[in-house]
Amino acid sequence: MRRVHIIGNLHMGPTNQGNGQGYSSGGFIADSRVDSIVSTGSQQQWYTRDSNVGVWYDGVWNTVFSGVAGAPPQSFPAPPDTTVATTPVSREKPYLYIDSTGKYRVFVPSLDRKSVV
């Protein structure tokens, strides 16, 4: 998920077939805000970058945060959270948008260094 604002909780683990958290295998959040709780459920690998979260909960094998306000403290390997205060270098993918005249345009983000929310 990129560039979203979730007002409330965000639960990222499916519930299915009476199997509690279900099965899920990882994901990514960037340039986003979650006002309340993020629960990754059974996610096994996860990367969150340059975002703001209320409270982070769960994660199974390897959860990485860079430049994330509200991230859990560095604690690898137990629990398996790797937390870095800034994102050293990143570049977002280009994306389409509609300008003020209704025309489609392509925005190409610039290189970002040492970003932090």
Label the model's feature ranges.
Residues 1-117:
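Sequence-level preference for short, compositionally simple segments enriched
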